[in-house]
């Protein structure tokens, strides 16, 4: 792949792959589109991670998905045949959001949550009082009624994650909490606009919900998920991480690769998910610094391509 003077992406194979992996202690993996699709592991992925673990590499899992807890991810990894993982090796946006609020909120403060059971579970584990998960109905037939619904005095943050019950009623309540003043934080798990499904279809992602709340509140949310470096800071707070000896492996340029590049990691794109080699070429040939930040150091067709470099 020819470059114009900026970042240059190369296929990771052969002796280059062996040399790169030999100089790495930690690999951070996105999950969906990298390790599995839905409930099926991608071919060769469990074997590749098994070889990496056997070689003494630290494996961590960094995902924007807020609909699973850390424990649920470890169970899925086990079920799909990946090396055993402890919850402390999983960094989902639900866990990272709870960690952020535990640091940012005063004792006893609560969060109003647009999200599901996993987000609620991580907040509970972090000791953060919260309300909001589940369906919500408007409190009356007229806008005047909607503006008079009871508010919980302890709420000092609005947290937006993936919420299948997102509604106008919830949007109204979120806005009313945020209008109480700038001391009420607005936090989002991620800005992913779409969640790709099998067969090329997609559903709206959490980013759509975050944008709705931002638009109503006329405020910008603090995002804890990729490409924010906060999620990497969560990893670095748990483990002694040397960025120069760490690889971020992902399938999305605008989240996985951008975060890795921002944090000074080696970045590896796998072509089993969202982003394509054509997109990489377009960014690589651009003189725009922002687009250059989306160019990975290396790419592979799939994680299974690492297997030859891991042979004894």
Curated annotation (Swiss-Prot):
Q: What class of enzyme is it?
A: hydrolase
Its annotated function is as follows: Glycerol-3-phosphate phosphatase hydrolyzing glycerol-3-phosphate into glycerol. Thereby, regulates the cellular levels of glycerol-3-phosphate a metabolic intermediate of glucose, lipid and energy metabolism. Was also shown to have a 2-phosphoglycolate phosphatase activity and a tyrosine-protein phosphatase activity. However, their physiological relevance is unclear. In vitro, also has a phosphatase activity toward ADP, ATP, GDP and GTP.
Q: Which residues bind Mg(2+)?
A: 30, 32, 251
Q: According to the UniProt entry, what is the EC number of this protein?
A: 3.1.3.21, 3.1.3.48
Q: Could you tell me which CDD domains the record lists for this protein?
A: HAD_Pase_UmpH-like
Family membership noted in the UniProt record: Belongs to the HAD-like hydrolase superfamily. CbbY/CbbZ/Gph/YieH family.
Q: What keywords are annotated for this sequence in UniProt? A: Carbohydrate metabolism, Hydrolase, Magnesium, Metal-binding
The catalysed reaction is: O-phospho-L-tyrosyl-[protein] + H2O = L-tyrosyl-[protein] + phosphate; sn-glycerol 1-phosphate + H2O = glycerol + phosphate; sn-glycerol 3-phosphate + H2O = glycerol + phosphate
Q: What is this protein called?
A: Glycerol-3-phosphate phosphatase
Q: Which GO terms describe its cellular component?
A: cytoplasm
The family database entries (PANTHER family) matched by this protein are listed as: 4-NITROPHENYLPHOSPHATASE-RELATED, GLYCEROL-3-PHOSPHATE PHOSPHATASE
The record ties this protein, via InterPro entries, to:
HAD-like_sf (IPR036412), HAD-SF_hydro_IIA (IPR006357), HAD_sf (IPR023214), PGP_euk (IPR006349)
Question: GO molecular function: any one?
Answer: metal ion binding
- Give site residues, Important for substrate specificity: 195
Q: Which organism is it from?
A: Gallus gallus (Chicken)
> How the cofactor binds, per note?
Binds 1 Mg(2+) ion per subunit.
Name of encoding gene: PGP
Active-site feature positions = 30, 32
């Amino acid at each position: 792949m020819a470059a114009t003077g900026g970042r240059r992406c190369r296929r990771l194979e052969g002796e280059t792959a062996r040399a790169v992996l030999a100089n790495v202690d930690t690999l951070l993996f996105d999950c969906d589109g990298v390790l599995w699709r839905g409930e099926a592991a991608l071919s060769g992925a469990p074997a590749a991670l098994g070889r990496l673990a056997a070689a003494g590499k630290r494996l961590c899992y960094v995902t924007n998905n807020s609909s699973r807890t850390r424990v649920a991810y470890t169970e899925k990894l086990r079920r799909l045949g990946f090396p055993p993982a402890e919850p402390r090796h999983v960094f989902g946006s639900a866990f990272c959001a709870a960690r952020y609020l535990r640091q940012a909120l005063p004792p006893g403060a609560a969060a109003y949550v647009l999200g599901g059971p996993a987000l609620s579970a991580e907040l509970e584990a972090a000791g953060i009082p919260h309300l909001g998960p589940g369906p919500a109905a408007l409190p009356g037939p007229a806008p005047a009624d909607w503006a008079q619904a009871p508010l919980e005095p302890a709420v000092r943050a609005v947290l937006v994650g993936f919420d299948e019950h997102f509604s106008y009623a919830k949007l109204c309540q979120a806005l009313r909490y945020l209008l109480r003043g700038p001391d009420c934080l607005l936090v989002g798990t991620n800005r992913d606009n779409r969640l790709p499904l099998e067969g090329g279809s997609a559903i709206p992602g959490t980013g759509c919900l975050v944008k709705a709340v931002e638009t109503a509140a006329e405020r910008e949310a603090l995002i804890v998920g990729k490409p924010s470096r906060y999620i990497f800071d969560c990893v670095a707070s748990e483990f002694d991480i040397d960025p120069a000896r760490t690889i971020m492996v992902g399938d999305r340029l605008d989240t996985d690769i951008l975060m890795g590049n921002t944090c000074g990691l080696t970045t590896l794109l796998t072509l089993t998910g969202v982003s394509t080699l054509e997109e990489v070429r377009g960014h690589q040939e651009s003189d725009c610094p922002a687009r250059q930040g989306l160019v990975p150091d290396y790419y592979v067709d799939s994680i299974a391509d690492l297997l030859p470099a891991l042979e004894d």
